[in-house]
């Protein structure tokens, strides 16, 4: 049994790791909203808006790096992250021309920020389920803070409102070591120690083994994703559902996908129910979008994604359970949900940019 102090300590650490895991998405969100104006800076706008799918893809690529090399990158990464954020802060305050320097700064810092989701998720999803909810709460809170800053135009008024970004980096990077030292995490890691494996200290699931254990879960996630992408295309062309949402939807997609959703009961039943709700809601929006008005149409359109996230969360939770004996089970989860993030954010970019409703 573990003490209450150990649980509280780990809960605080994983909450801070949730703040840390949000930083690549917040970085993209801030640049896409503050510095992208299609009339005055067309190519910069495309760079910033493509940052969302790029961040998802880079987070997946970081999972291919061996754990010992990823851990060694922590100190240089945090130093360069903070330095880049300080330079951006200075440019916002003192410079009037950032049309070249800002995109270079954005592209230089983004790959290093994408290291944090990998390191955070690798720790969090080895811990008990209650601590995973703390992580998801931290990620959701961080995304919400910056979304509200943009809605209230606080970031446009003063660069001081970038300060939470520095706090997230400092708290999160400092919590990595604390979470690894916690006895609850180390006991979870010990349960994944290999006994008969010749390579490595812990059991690692290969691609073949993952496909063997979770074929139907992966197929169901793929089918749900294709369904919602088709819904996005049809509703964008017919009902103009992205009008007024293009500034906030990418952050919502990344944050909600990484956070999961509400999942209770059997995963296959939940997935079927959520797919049915997605289909019925999209039919309502398609035929009644003029009657619903802008607000009703937007609420129903967002609810389609909430249903989708809940279905994927149930399926990914089932995958993590099937891979619970493997130390890289959390990384398999990251690859699946962040590839879904990539598909949605890239699809949203193509629809809003090139296919006019």
Curated annotation (Swiss-Prot):
One of its GO terms (cellular component) is virion membrane. Residues 33-46, 92-98, 155-158, 239-240, 289-298, 357 are intravirion. Extensively glycosylated by O-linked oligosaccharides. Residues 1-11, 68-70, 122-133, 180-217, 262-267, 320-335 are virion surface. Keywords: Glycoprotein, Host cell membrane, Host membrane, Host-virus interaction, Membrane, Transmembrane, Viral attachment to host cell, Virion, Virus entry into host cell. Signal peptide: none annotated. Its main location: virion. It comes from the Viruses. The chain crosses the membrane at residues 12-32, 47-67, 71-91, 99-121, 134-154, 159-179, 218-238, 241-261, 268-288, 299-319, 336-356. A motif (Integrin binding site) lies at residues 199-201. Interacts with BDLF2. Interacts with host beta1 integrin family. Facilitates virus attachment to oral epithelial cells by binding to host beta1 integrin family. Participates in rearrangement of cellular actin to increase intercellular contacts by binding BDLF2 and thereby promote virus cell-to-cell spreading. This is Protein BMRF2.
